[in-house]
Design a protein with these regions (language model features):
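Active-site-proximal, glycine-rich beta->alpha crossover segments in alpha/beta enzymes
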Residues: 1-37
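Histidine-acidic metal/acid-base catalytic patches
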Residues: 14-24, 37-49, 53, 63-174
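Residue-level "edge-of-site" marker
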Residues: 60
Length: 174
């Protein structure tokens, strides 16, 4: 690994990389979710006091890599996160690219059902092939129905306005 790992600058030999990876061999989805929920239970009360809206970004890619589990890949994962710490400050970065890589994710449905805690939007289009590989695509040419997603997000914003919520803005980046 020439360029290092996230959060590190040093490179690794394959042997060193495998040794580091082995330290995570006993961490499965259940343990990783428990760790995430423990973190959120500590940080969300502080976020509430500070008026900060936390928003977790979905896994990218939304499937295990190198044997490491992923726990923010589906609507059920987001529901689990919301239920673990029930606070409007415990929210989601809605990334159409990360969620859109999985054909079983209903992006418009996720907005309709869980949109009240979307605090940031990351509009990306991805294109899947028959083997499950994917690549970035032009916004209107990928597998994401960008029109339907944007319509659902605008309807969510209108709901927020109608009930007098202060957080009507959902910042986004393309």
């Amino acid at each position: 690994i020439i360029a290092g790992l996230p959060g590190a600058e040093e490179g690794y030999t394959l042997k060193e990389f495998n040794q580091i990876l082995a330290t995570y061999k006993n961490i499965g989805p259940k343990e990783l979710k428990a760790n995430l929920f423990s973190f959120l239970s500590e940080i969300i009360p502080a976020a509430e006091k500070a008026g900060v809206l936390m928003c977790i970004h979905p896994d990218d890619p939304p499937f295990p890599i190198l044997g490491l589990p992923r726990v923010v890949s589906t609507e059920q994962d987001v529901e689990d996160i919301y239920n673990a710490v029930q606070s409007p400050n415990n929210g989601l970065t809605f990334c159409t690219g990360s969620f859109g890589v999985r054909a079983d994710n209903d992006l418009t449905g996720i907005v309709e059902r869980l949109g009240d805690r979307i605090h940031f939007i990351h509009l990306r289009a991805t294109k899947r092939d028959e083997d499950g590989n994917f690549h970035e695509a032009d916004h209107l040419e990928g597998d994401v129905d960008m029109y339907a997603v944007l319509k659902a997000l605008i309807l969510e914003q209108q709901k927020r306005i109608a009930v007098g919520r202060q957080d009507i803005r959902m910042p986004f980046r393309p």
